[in-house]
Regions:
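Short, solvent-exposed polar/charged micro-motifs at secondary-structure junctions
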Residues: 48-49, 71-76, 103, 120-122
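Alpha-helical substrate-recognition element adjacent to the catalytic core
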Residues: 1-73, 148-149
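Short, well-structured alpha-helical segments in soluble
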Residues: 77-85
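Acidic, Mg2+-coordinating phosphoryl-transfer loop and its flanking beta/alpha structural elements
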Residues: 86-128
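Short acidic-hydrophobic, aromatic-tinged amphipathic segments that line or gate anion-handling sites
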Residues: 61-64, 110-112, 126-135
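Non-catalytic pre-domain segments flanking phosphatase-related domains
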Residues: 1-5, 131-149
Length: 149
């Protein structure tokens, strides 16, 4: 398989420069039998240094932030660029929206949900967000109609 693995949130923590041990385990399990490319929002120099210092070696490709275009989400653009080079058969990410986008675009996605590194906005145990005002108005309207009948 050709696998794309996100550096942020999978290999590294979102809130520190420390490597994620579970992410390292997953990386080396995938690397044992598959082609693994790493994508990141960092520069090539920053990413190569971090990967070397933290023992992530043997990756097949590094897709850095040079593919950023105004108006496009960088990670989606990176996946599109990777797909233009060869088949991408799996995306590993800690971002639920990117996993959903990958799935919608025909790429199997593995959502790496680690409680210590997943962004707070994406955690399933965070209290639900406030409802949009339009949704509240709809509920009030339906309730008023029901009461008037």
């Amino acid at each position: 398989l050709n696998v794309l693995v996100s550096l942020e949130g999978v290999l590294s923590s979102d809130n520190s420069d420390n490597p994620n041990r579970a992410g390292a385990l997953l990386y080396y399990a995938l690397k044992a039998g598959h082609r693994v490319a790493i994508f990141t929002s960092w520069t090539q120099e920053q990413a190569e240094h971090w990967l070397l210092v933290n023992g992530f070696v043997g990756y097949d490709e590094l897709i850095d932030n040079r593919y950023d275009l105004i108006g496009d989400e960088l990670s989606k653009r990176q996946i599109t660029v990777a797909r233009s080079r060869q088949a991408v058969e799996m995306v590993v990410t800690a971002e639920p929206s990117l996993a959903a986008w990958s799935f919608e675009n025909g790429i199997p996605a593995l959502l790496f949900a680690h409680p210590d590194t997943m962004g707070i906005a994406n955690r399933p145990d965070v209290p639900s967000k406030m409802r949009p005002w339009g949704s509240i108005e709809d509920v009030i309207t339906k309730r008023n109609i029901k009461r008037s009948q």
